[in-house]
Regions:
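PLP-dependent aspartate aminotransferase-fold enzymes
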Residues: 94-205
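N-terminal glycine-rich, Lys/His-bearing helix-loop that initiates the first secondary-structure elements
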Residues: 1-104, 178, 195-197, 201-203
């Protein structure tokens, strides 16, 4: 097995991938709660990133660590859960449905990943809108094929399919890809301190 020291991680990754992430090296064992342990500099950092909010309960939550062996056994096989079912999947869905699913919504839909999550929300919104227009006797896509999704400037929603038309943080992330010309709204951010220049900018927003 290859062994790499924390101070070698970035140089090693750079030989094979675009390694432009943060300058720290996460210690998967010593990170805990809302604290990342950086093994590159042997320090703890307050985690206000939470991996784009995909880790809402923090690092190494005790209840998850208790199930480490079970979770590891399940994770060995990356099953296509839409096609192949297991007892473990049924138990997970039953638990999530009992604790998190609102009574007025009969079904759940699961997506792994932020961009695909955004993309499926867009598809659900488009589907709902077209069904709503049909119920009202209004023209559908055949007569009005252009669907617009309003979104903020400075937004990053991913780089897959529809999300390319929403992402606009850095042109290099979306250049050379076909995109929809959807309306972009000024991001109503506030820059501190609020001086005369900032007040004037806010008035324009």
């Amino acid at each position: 097995m290859v062994r790499i020291r924390p101070d070698e991680v970035h140089s090693s990754l750079s030989r094979n991938i675009l390694a432009d992430g943060f300058g720290l090296v996460v210690d998967l064992d010593r990170s805990h709660g809302c604290r990342i342990h950086d093994s590159r500099r042997d320090r703890e950092i307050l985690d206000m990133f939470s991996c784009f909010a995909t880790m809402p309960i923090g690092w190494n939550h005790p209840r998850l660590v208790e199930q480490e062996a079970r979770l590891g056994r399940i994770a060995v096989n990356n099953i296509t859960n839409s096609d192949l079912y297991s007892v473990e999947m049924a138990e997970a869905i039953e638990t999530i449905g009992r604790l998190a699913k609102p009574d007025h919504l009969p079904h759940m839909f699961f997506i792994a990943g932020g961009a695909l999550g955004v993309e499926n929300c867009l598809k659900a919104a488009m589907d709902w809108k077209q069904q709503d227009r049909t119920r009202k006797g209004l023209p559908g896509d055949d007569d009005h094929p252009h669907v617009s999704i309003a979104h903020f400037e400075e937004a990053f929603h991913g780089r897959s399919g529809y999300t390319l038309s929403l992402t606009n943080t850095d042109p290099i992330k979306t250049d050379r890809f076909v995109k929809f010309d959807w309306p972009r709204i000024t991001n109503p951010t506030i820059h501190f301190p609020i001086d005369e220049t900032e007040s004037a900018r806010l008035d324009e927003v």
